[in-house]
Amino acid sequence: MEGTTPGTPQAYEDYEETVSYEDAVTRVGYDESAVERWAVEPDKRPGRTAFQRDRARVLHSSALRRLAGKTQVVTPGTRSRAWDASPRTRLTHSLECAQVGRELGAALGCDPDLVEAACLSHDLGHPPFGHNGEQALNEFAEDCGGFEGNAQSLRLLARIEPKRFVRSEGSGELVSVGLNLTRAALDAATKYPWPRRAHPTDPTSPKFGVYEDDRPVFDWIRKGAPGHRTCFEAQVMDWADDVAYSVHDVEDGLHAGHIDPNCLHAEPERQAVFAVAIGRYVPADTDPAELAEALDRLLDQEWWPHGYDGSAVAQARLKDATSQLIGRFCLAAEGATRAAYGSGRLTRYAAELVVPRAARLECAVLKAVADWYVMQRAEQERLRADQRVVVAELAEALTARAPEGLDPQFWALFDEAADDRARKRVIVDQIASLTDVAARSLHARLTGHL
């Protein structure tokens, strides 16, 4: 359970006891710093690489399991036969992202276990009710550093998820270091390597990857990293995420009957989709004609589903279309990246993932299709409004009554918090950890809204 003081570099000799330098590092293109851990710990079993251990730790984490109860596109149990029978959740999305990322990463020379660990980790910090809950929590947390799902993922991996504890040099008390993943794994899971309001090109961007009180581990992760660049494995994870959710959200929309593929030939429908794409998924100055060309390229494919009736044959054709799309997007990135960097192993900061503009536009159009036909339905907006109320009222109730209502883990952290700002962050951590059902249940118990 215990290790050494956080931030102490792990001597490679400790790691070398179980895996040779040649096998663990040189063979896969990673140096000693990549396999260092925030806190030194002994290896348990010979024959496992550091990144295999990272992947296993994320796979067995309670944070990953909780994603089964968190919204992906539509909340499970909303009277859609398709979603009620087999709803896609944050967990299934993460597993699909991991499969896509692992294969693309391996094709480009990354360690596949490292990329898979990053893909499994990328949504761990998302709160109940998806981006809707994220917005409500960010409003509540405005005066204690805000809330961002990616920053929360890092906080979970490095502090909250109970796996490893070390003795503090100052007080001698046990301090959590989370899953104590390698530097490379934490870096690969860091999609936005900058703090709040420090976006390298857009200071107004709400995206960031670290809270101020998590800066010590973040600075350790980024030691030697060039500026705000994301590592190559994080770029692979990011594209795998885009590919997985753009393709599968459309698949779910077709399966549930919310998307009629024939509508995509009608000009008013197309313009509505392009407006969503320009508003959310592509630069604002993108020419709609480019989006029209991207959509037409997809519609012209022989495997594109031009109808869907739910029959076994239709389901098989739809599944083939999803496979074709995933392959199309991954091969485009693989081919363009290889053309730019050659056939060697591409790892860490040795390269940038090259995704052709055509592939990015096609992916963006798919996101916009799912957004327009699924997420922007009137009943979904009513549901989202109710979800925002649940999160806001739950935050107020916990603020007034904490530590009552907190899980034992967060109760202890609340008692140890130094000031109101720190106590508020604990409440945010508690709410972010809840599943959709658990959030509603706790809200009902604390507010009496049964």
Curated annotation (Swiss-Prot):
Biological process, per Gene Ontology: dGTP catabolic process
Keyword Kinase: no
Keywords on record: Hydrolase
Xref: PROSITE patterns: HD
Boundaries of every HD domain copy: 90-246
Superkingdom as given in the UniProt entry: Bacteria
A GO MF label: dGTPase activity
Kinase keyword on record: no
InterPro entries: dGTPase, dGTPase-like, dNTPase_2, HD/PDEase_dom, HD_domain, PHydrolase_assoc_dom
NCBIfam families: dGTP_triPase, PRK03007.1
Family statement drawn from the similarity comment of this UniProt entry: Belongs to the dGTPase family. Type 2 subfamily.
PANTHER family according to UniProt: DEOXYGUANOSINETRIPHOSPHATE TRIPHOSPHOHYDROLASE (PTHR11373:SF32), DEOXYNUCLEOSIDE TRIPHOSPHATE TRIPHOSPHOHYDROLASE (PTHR11373)
Protein name: Deoxyguanosinetriphosphate triphosphohydrolase-like protein
Primary gene name: dgt
